[in-house]
């Protein structure tokens, strides 16, 4: 990662006066929202926007890869208006394939550089709304019962005593899992990275559809380890569950969660209103009460106290342009399907 100053600055940010002010129930019309974060945060955002504007929001929650696939399937007859949340890689692929549309928000001037970098990489078709680091969470009771050291590194997840006791999502449906795939390739090199994923496959009990699901499974003791964005493990640690979040010792990748307007949106003006509103400190402050602890993109937005300290982690210089490209993402997913998922257990 080229600079972590944006993270340090965010730690001291205070909630600023919202740049968006709308009188409740005065606006008319509707908005179809595809949401790529946790259900509770999705509903907090859709309900708050509806209350402030009077615009009726029809929200559907899916993983980022699923939303990308839906936009592609609906491209000849778009049904959605705004895609809010989910890892930036599929947002970039959607932008490259013309599934989303250009927009420059007046809020751009208030955003961290990494959020604008995403906007530039997408040729103005997507923007960063939050950041989060990749890692895993382990169930402390299960690890103790197995009599093995607490895992601190990616390499530790290959321990034979963790056979069928690691969960991670499928990168075809999950932006989290694709981020893992791209991270391992960048961290280890493609050949060694795929060797790692093949070895990890022996310990994976289930490839889930949702990227955050393995964190919940680990918190409940349904699996010993869940590979997730670290903030998803923090959710359960904060509420007292026996799960410990880990930033892997070798280094790790991170996401720029993003937002895009669907090309051909039937409610384009309302999509732009939501886009502008979602970039305000007031809207971004809805994350923490919804148990979402990512680092927000507006410089004046409050950073949740529970947020993982990304400036203290060993982060790779994740190449969002390359790994968010249609050709590279398609190639890596096909290779993973053939060389990893198809392997016998």
Language-model features: locations:
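Early extracytoplasmic/lumenal segment of secretory-pathway proteins
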Residues: 28-93
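Extracytoplasmic ligand-binding site segments that recognize negatively charged/polar headgroups
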Residues: 36, 40-43, 79-222
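Short beta-strand->loop
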Residues: 101-110, 126, 155, 241-253, ...
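Mature extracytoplasmic/periplasmic domains
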Residues: 262-320
């Amino acid at each position: 990662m080229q600079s972590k100053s944006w993270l340090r600055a965010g730690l001291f940010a205070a909630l600023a006066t919202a740049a968006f002010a709308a009188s409740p129930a005065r606006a008319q019309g509707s908005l179809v929202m595809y949401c790529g974060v946790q259900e509770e945060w999705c509903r907090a955002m859709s309900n708050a926007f509806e209350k402030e504007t009077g615009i009726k929001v029809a929200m559907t929650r899916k993983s980022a890869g699923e939303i990308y696939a839906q936009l592609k399937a609906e491209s000849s007859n778009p049904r959605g208006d705004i895609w809010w949340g989910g890892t930036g890689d599929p947002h970039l692929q959607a932008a490259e394939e013309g599934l989303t549309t250009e927009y420059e928000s007046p809020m751009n001037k208030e955003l961290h550089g990494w959020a604008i970098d995403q906007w530039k990489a997408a040729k103005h078709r997507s923007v960063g709304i939050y950041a989060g680091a990749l890692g895993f969470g382990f169930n402390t009771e299960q690890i103790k019962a197995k009599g093995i050291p607490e895992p601190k590194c990616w390499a530790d997840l290959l321990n034979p005593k963790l056979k069928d006791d690691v969960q991670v999502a499928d990168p075809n449906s999950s932006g989290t899992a694709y981020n893992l795939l791209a991270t391992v390739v960048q961290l280890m090199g493609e050949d060694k990275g795929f060797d790692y994923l093949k070895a990890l496959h022996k310990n994976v009990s289930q490839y889930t559809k949702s990227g955050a699901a393995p964190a919940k499974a680990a918190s409940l003791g349904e699996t010993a380890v869940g590979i997730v964005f670290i903030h998803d493990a923090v959710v359960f640690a904060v509420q007292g569950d026996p799960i410990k979040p880990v930033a892997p010792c070798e280094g790790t990748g991170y996401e720029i969660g993003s937002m895009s307007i669907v090309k051909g949106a039937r409610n384009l003006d309302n999509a732009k209103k939501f886009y502008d509103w979602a970039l305000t400190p007031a809207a971004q402050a809805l994350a923490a009460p919804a148990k979402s602890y990512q680092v927000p993109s507006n410089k004046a937005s409050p950073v949740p106290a529970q947020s993982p300290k990304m400036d203290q982690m060993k982060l790779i210089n994740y190449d969002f342009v390359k790994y968010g490209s249609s050709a590279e993402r398609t190639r890596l997913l096909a290779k993973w399907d053939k060389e990893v998922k198809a392997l016998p257990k």
